Amino acid sequence: MFIYDTKLKQKVPFEPLVHNKANIYVCGPTVYDDAHLGHARSAIAFDLLRRTLELSGYEVVLVRNFTDIDDKIINKAFKENKSIQELSSIYIESYTRDLNALNVKQPSLEPKASEYLDAMVRMIETLLEKNFAYRVSNGDIYLDTSKDKDYGSLSMHNSSVEFSRIGLVQEKRLEQDFVLWKSYKGDNDVGFDSPLGKGRPGWHIECSSMVFETLALANAPYQIDIHAGGTDLLFPHHENEACQTRCAFGVEIAKYWMHNGFVNINNEKMSKSLGNSFFIKDALKNYDGEILRNYLLGVHYRSVLNFNEEDLLMSKKRLDKIYRLKQRVLGTLGGINPNFKKEILECMQDDLNVSKALSVLESMLSSTNEKLDQNPKNKALKGEILANLKFIEELLGIGFKDPSAYFQLGVSESEKQEIENKIEERKRAKEQKDFLKADSIREELLQQKIALMDTPQGTIWEKLF
């Protein structure tokens, strides 16, 4: 297995800290709003990593957190007259619902920052004791980045003392010094009683503490195997996580760093701050979650994905091919083609080379369809094909539906009944040699984007996009 390590800026062999085990920490969302397609892409990217590792024989523990203490949450909760717990729980439920729709596997653990306050306080106390942190006059506590000789080594941001000094009001020693603890400021603020005084943790200390509490190995040069997240988190968040872990514990937080690329809308980076977010829940109103997943995984995880509906519909053709083939082989048993399994898994073991893997998949779909055309009753062949498709389901997380359900997505039960009635009416017309009426019914349904296919087993139908 090879992965691209952001810190080394090259592909490297994955050599876990413990043989055949992989510990992964993925930065999850700050839950003050609904999740957008950038969140979806990150979740899918590292879901693919997890699936690939598991199918390669690794025992994987994947932790993805919820940041439920943050300025944005506090500000929105105040505006909506809610507690931060009420507000964050709404968006945690929304995020979970969205990712379930995208067939992202549940993490091994989903810690909330609010559940690890004691651990954060202990870590800050350690940093103060070791003289890596300092308190300013308003009670806030900062990490002194000048004390960490490796600061900037992950993101390559300059960490020299030549960084501009900032106002005495904040009393930060260097611009890149970051807050560990925010003291309680009174009305409209949120604070927790602690040995540090009443206040709340900074963003960066939250993740480092949760990594330490949920995954960190004792007596190892690294706490975990892989730390992952979006490219936008590389600096300052991941840089600061790495810094405070080195300072507090004398070890690196992660052996490998992996980052997924941005999602662009109209060639601009999508973000809430730019006001061009495309929420997952809105996309799901137009497209099934599997169709969205199939599209988002189709571009290599490190590349920028420029979202547009034309490409999404083009990518859906791949799913259509999978389900048409699946429809032909349902109800058969057999073993997977070992060459197909080896070839497609090796593609994914090469830093999740999904483009190459999808090319192998397309080749399998074409060749096996041809073989079925030549020998449609070959049960062994059908069983092998179904086993191949099952492996794709496990590896890529697509192709898991019943074909009939897939091709009838977006059609209500009452509409299905109307279509079945029309098919029955058309059948009677054909029996009575009224082919004009039969053709008229087919055309009427086609106008409603319902396509009919006559098969030896009867007429089947599907919804067109």
From Swiss-Prot:
Lineage: Bacteria, Pseudomonadati, Campylobacterota, Epsilonproteobacteria, Campylobacterales
Location relative to the cell: Cytoplasm
Gene that encodes it: cysS
Protein name from the UniProt record: Cysteine--tRNA ligase
N-terminal signal peptide: none
Cofactor: Zn(2+)
UniProt cross-references to SUPFAM superfamilies, sorted A to Z: Anticodon-binding domain of a subclass of class I aminoacyl-tRNA synthetases (SSF47323), Nucleotidylyl transferase (SSF52374)
Natural source organism: Helicobacter pylori (strain J99 / ATCC 700824)
Motif 'KMSKS' region per record, residues: 269-273
Catalytic activity: tRNA(Cys) + L-cysteine + ATP = L-cysteinyl-tRNA(Cys) + AMP + diphosphate
Enzymatic class: ligase
InterPro entries per record: Cys-tRNA-ligase (IPR015803), Cys-tRNA-synt_Ia_DALR (IPR015273), Cys-tRNA/MSH_ligase (IPR024909), Rossmann-like_a/b/a_fold (IPR014729), tRNA-synt_1_cat_dom (IPR032678), tRNAsynth_Ia_anticodon-bd (IPR009080)
